[in-house]
Structure formats: structure tokens, C-alpha cells
């Protein structure tokens, strides 16, 4: 009987201290952005992303990015990602300083051009979220 009570007490303690699903969801920040792809570079861009460099994928994960996707339609690339870290700016600086990521961008950047509405210095233009369903 003492063992059962101890076991139930342990379960209660762990269930109270474990992060709730709602808390975990709140830690995820969603980002979407858009950029043009040059028509003559589309096939090369798709080829690169069909076989992404493992080091680049590892850096994305190391910088707290998950569930990252890029879609294409009518000359436009649309990206979606989820960020789970605590300092987005620091993680983006870390990624930008990574030598393999820099090499990757030297391959992908010539394939792209900012949309007309991009802000000064903005490459991928951030999008406003207008709806989300949990």
C-alpha cells in the first residue's frame, strides 16, 4: 500500500511540474515570408532544395527553427517556419555568421529578388498573419 501511495504521489508531482501543452504551444512563434524567384533560376533553386546541405539544415535546427517549408507559385516563393527559441535576433545573427550558411546563400541569393513592397534592406519580406487555427 505504501508503494502505491508513493507511486501515485510521484505521478502527481510530475504531472504538476511538466509543461502543459498550452504552454508549449505559446513558445512557438510562426513566421511567413515571400520573395520572387528569377524564372531562369527556378530549376536550379528547386534542385538545391531537393538536396539541401546537411550542415545548413543542422544550423536551422540549432537556431531553434522547426517545421520550415518553402512553397512556389507564379514566380513567388512563400516560406513558413516556426521558431522555438528565446532570442530570435541572436539566433538569426548566429545563422548569418555560419560559414556553410553563407555558402548556401551564395547559391540561393542569385536565384531570388525582393518583392516590390519589401522594406529597405529586406530580402524575404515578412508577412502579417491574419488567421491561425490551433
How should these model regions be labeled?
Residues 57-78, 82-86:
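Short, glycine- and small/hydrophobic-rich beta-strand elements in well-ordered beta-sheets
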